[in-house]
Structure formats: C-alpha cells, structure tokens
C-alpha cells in the first residue's frame, strides 16, 4: 500500500516537471511559431467556399455555383453533379431539406437552359 502511494506521488511529480518543461519550451518557441503563421498565405485560411446566401430568384450563375459546374454545362454533367451532391445531402440521410430544394431548383434551372 505504501509503495503504491509513493509510486503515484512520483508519477504526479514527474508529470508536473514535464509540464513545466513543456511550458518553458513553448515560451522560447513562440516567436518562431508566430513567424511561421505569418508566412503562411492568407488564402490558406479564408476557406474555399462561396461566401454569401441564396438570391431571392435563382440565377444561372448561382445554379452553376451550387452544382459546381459551368453555366454552359451539358445535361449529362448537370445530372452527374446533381446526383453526386444529392447523395451527400439527401434529407432522408440527415441532409437539409432547404439545401436539397435549392439543389433541385439549380438542376431544373440549368437543365431547362442546357443542350442535350
């Protein structure tokens, strides 16, 4: 029993010393870490998604952005993009019904204007 208490005490002390060492090492590394973060391009953190909501009336450009295709894409590409996105965001599998409606609206708009 006494040896267990001593072992636990030594383990806690070792963890404390290790934590103290890590904190001191971090203080010395702080300028280097700041320099690395400043040298990274700003676009790395800006996100690769469209910043903005939906237009009240969907445009051809917005529909193309939603499906991730060119505004002049043919029906085959539009259908493939629609299928891929709906598999990821179907309401029956936890996706948003609103987003699914917008995806369907985008497909309908682009297919109405697309070539066969």
From Swiss-Prot:
Membrane-spanning parts: 4-24
Ranges for domain J: 62-116
Tagged with keyword Ribosomal protein: no
Sections of the chain in a coiled coil: none
Residues with the Phosphoserine modification: 39, 70
Compartmental location: Mitochondrion inner membrane
PROSITE patterns for the chain: DNAJ_2
Main subcellular location of this protein, as a coarse class: mitochondrion
Entries under Pfam families matching the protein: DnaJ
One GO BP: intracellular protein transport
Record CDD domains: DnaJ
Stretches assigned to the Mitochondrial matrix side: 25-116
Chain positions found as N-acetylalanine: 2
Subunit structure: Interacts with PHB2; the interaction associates DNAJC19 with the prohibitin complex. Interacts with TIMM16/PAM16. May be a component of the PAM complex at least composed of a mitochondrial HSP70 protein, GRPEL1 or GRPEL2, TIMM44, TIMM16/PAM16 and TIMM14/DNAJC19.
Similarity remark: Belongs to the TIM14 family.
Protein's recorded name: Mitochondrial import inner membrane translocase subunit TIM14
Species of the source: Homo sapiens
Name of the encoding gene: DNAJC19
């Amino acid at each position: 029993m006494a040896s267990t208490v001593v072992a636990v005490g030594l383990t806690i002390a070792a963890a404390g010393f290790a934590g103290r060492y890590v904190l001191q090492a971090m203080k010395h590394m702080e300028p280097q870490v700041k320099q690395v973060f400043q040298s990274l391009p700003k676009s790395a953190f800006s996100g690769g998604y469209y910043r903005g909501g939906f237009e009240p009336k969907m445009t051809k450009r917005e529909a193309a952005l939603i499906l991730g295709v060119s505004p002049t894409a043919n029906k085959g590409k539009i259908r493939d993009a629609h299928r891929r996105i709906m598999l990821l965001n179907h309401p029956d599998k936890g996706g948003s019904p609103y987003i699914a409606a917008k995806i369907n609206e985008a497909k309908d708009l682009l297919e109405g204007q697309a070539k066969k």
